[in-house]
Swiss-Prot record:
EC number, UniProt record: 7.3.2.1
Entry's family note: Belongs to the ABC transporter superfamily. Phosphate importer (TC 3.A.1.7) family.
Subcellular localization(s) per the UniProt record: Cell inner membrane
Function: Part of the ABC transporter complex PstSACB involved in phosphate import. Responsible for energy coupling to the transport system.
One cellular-component annotation, GO: plasma membrane
Occurrences of domain ABC transporter (ranges): 9-255
Cysteines paired by S-S bonds: none
Protein's name according to its UniProt entry: Phosphate import ATP-binding protein PstB 2
Catalytic activity line of the entry: phosphate(out) + ATP + H2O = ADP + 2 phosphate(in) + H(+)
PANTHER family: ABC TRANSPORTER I FAMILY MEMBER 17, PHOSPHATE IMPORT ATP-BINDING PROTEIN PSTB 3
Organism of this sequence: Nostoc sp. (strain PCC 7120 / SAG 25.82 / UTEX 2576)
């Protein structure tokens, strides 16, 4: 392996169940530090479930069972001694639809910081500005920080949610189809943002958009489901190889549009 490729997250034989219903089975892959990894595959193949297992947010959806290991910089996140709140600060999440809180733009970004630390106002102001700049939103909102976040456009709201995640300085950012509800211009801005953030963050993104996966990611994992196995990872590799010369015929059929 290239010495520059350092895994931020190592997934080993991961299976996940909602109650007794299996959602993903036997997933093993690395998510490399300061790289973008795309998770692709047809609907119902476990992409979103998988990404939610990486910071244990899936547990908020009801009784679950986990088998296998998710190693985050040397620690199994499913170790019972893990501090889940600290884990979720280190591995942030951006969801499919923008979910700004019904409060001001400023307070949306400051929210997570206020929960985790009591800071002087000047320090908080600096963090909010830095996060909004990191999300490429500062110039658009700097004169209306006290206005409701609900008045922003859909694309601005999604970048605000990214800023909210950035404010608590995560090491990894998980993105679950972050552009599916956005128009092409807003999508382009989010993709540009992903490119700019990769130098600071490790990013994993679920997407149905094959073109988006080729544009933004360094590595791609293809998930699928068949009659014998549900929620399996068929193939993982460098994005250019996955899309131009996949090793598995199922991957080839999917990326060429023959199914899915």
């Amino acid at each position: 392996m290239n010495q520059q490729l350092v895994p931020a997250i190592k997934v080993k034989d991961l299976s996940f169940y909602y109650n007794t219903s299996k959602a993903i089975e036997g997933i093993s892959m690395d998510i490399y530090r300061n790289k973008v990894t795309a998770i692709i595959g047809p609907s119902g193949c476990g992409k979103s479930t998988f990404i939610k297992t990486l910071n244990r947010i899936s547990e908020l959806e009801g009784p679950v069972k986990v088998e296998g290991v998710v190693d985050f910089f040397g620690q199994n996140i499913y170790d019972p001694r893990i501090n889940i709140n600290r884990l979720r600060r280190q591995i942030g999440m951006v969801f499919q639809r923008p979910n700004p809180f019904p409060m001001s733009i400023y307070e949306n970004v400051a929210y997570g910081v206020r929960i985790s630390a009591k800071l002087p106002q000047a320090d908080l102001d600096e963090i909010v500005e830095s996060a909004l700049k990191g999300a490429a939103l500062w110039q658009e909102v700097k004169d209306k920080l006290n206005k409701s976040a609900l008045g922003l456009s859909g694309g601005q709201q999604q970048r605000l949610c990214i800023a909210r995640a950035l404010a608590i300085k995560p090491k990894v950012l998980l993105m679950d189809e972050p552009c599916s509800a956005l128009d092409p211009i807003a999508t382009m801005k989010v993709e540009e943002l992903i490119h700019s953030l990769r130098s600071e963050l490790t990013i994993a993104i679920v997407t149905h958009n094959m073109q988006q996966a080729t544009r933004v990611s360094d590595f791609t994992a293809f998930f699928s489901t068949d009659e014998s196995r549900i929620g399996q990872m068929v193939e993982f590799g460098v994005t250019t190889q996955i899309f131009s010369n996949p090793l598995d015929s199922r991957t080839r059929d999917y990326v060429s549009g023959r199914f899915g």
